[in-house]
Amino acid sequence: MDTDHRPQAEGAVLTPSAEAPPVAAPRIDCRDIRVFYGADQAIHNVSLSFPDRAVTALIGPSGCGKSTFLRCLNRMNDTIENCRVEGQILMDGQDINDHSIDPVLLRSRVGMVFQKPNPFPKSIYDNIAYGPRIHGLASSREDLDAIVEKSLRRAGLWEEVKDRLQAPGTSLSGGQQQRLCIARAIAVRPEVILMDEPCSALDPVATARIEELIDELRKRYCIVIVTHSMQQAARVSQRTAFFHLGNLIEMGETEQIFTNPREKRTEDYITGRFG
Ligand SMILES: Nc1ncnc2c1ncn2[C@@H]1O[C@H](COP(=O)(O)OP(=O)(O)OP(=O)(O)O)[C@@H](O)[C@H]1O
């Protein structure tokens, strides 16, 4: 069981953010989302929006639907055969599930970083260059080089890899591989970055590095992160949504959720009474 239930534990790398959530219009607006696996309903009528330039954490006990909900945001559930999503997800006013939307393009606008780092079996350079190439984002080799460098810099990896760009991505450490995957997502100019427990396969030092990076990236992107760690949610997010049994129980500023939750179920979860 995950024992990491307290936001203020010793050794926290960043202090819990006390910033108020931004008032900007939502980057993604989800209305009345219902998700089914065959006849089983995994998400029940969830309405939730995600602002730009902020990190929103999705927390809740195992099986409560965090990953299922996250996957709705870039239509990754389309790839699961018996999965059906109902409701509206608006991005810039357009429903992402509309037939006219190309899911491949959508996934470049809404990038995703997974639990286990999953670099392509290619060089460090090609891991980053692949997306810009297929999306036609570079008009010359110099352009592509510049995108690769900028993405690696933004992901805080450039200094560590600049002299071995032709080495395989898989030759990097786990934490470096996860930053490579973040750089790969950034390279196609996303507006939103989804992270599904991005640190769960990493040691504390690599985790701290990724958390610092998330804090840096939120100045530019709308970030949604699923995490089992209360400490992590408190450290990196400005807003937190608590899920239970496929329902959204409470959503608010991270500080409020952890210090003064409105719902008893939220309080029970964050104080470690269940989950
Ligand atoms: N591919 C699938 N087919 C059928 N049911 C699924 C599938 N994926 C998830 N589920 C079910 O949907 C529910 C929500 O699962 P989900 O993985 O979204 O929860 P979670 O909160 O992310 O869990 P965890 O924290 O353990 O990763 C669970 O009951 C799970 O068994």
Curated annotation (Swiss-Prot):
Keywords: ATP-binding, Cell inner membrane, Cell membrane, Membrane, Nucleotide-binding, Phosphate transport, Translocase, Transport. One of its GO terms (cellular component) is plasma membrane. One of its GO terms (molecular function) is ATP binding. ATP binds at residues 60-67. Pfam families: ABC_tran. It catalyses: phosphate(out) + ATP + H2O = ADP + 2 phosphate(in) + H(+). Residues 28-270 form the ABC transporter domain. It is a peripheral membrane protein. This is Phosphate import ATP-binding protein PstB. The lineage of its organism: Bacteria, Pseudomonadati, Pseudomonadota, Alphaproteobacteria, Hyphomonadales.
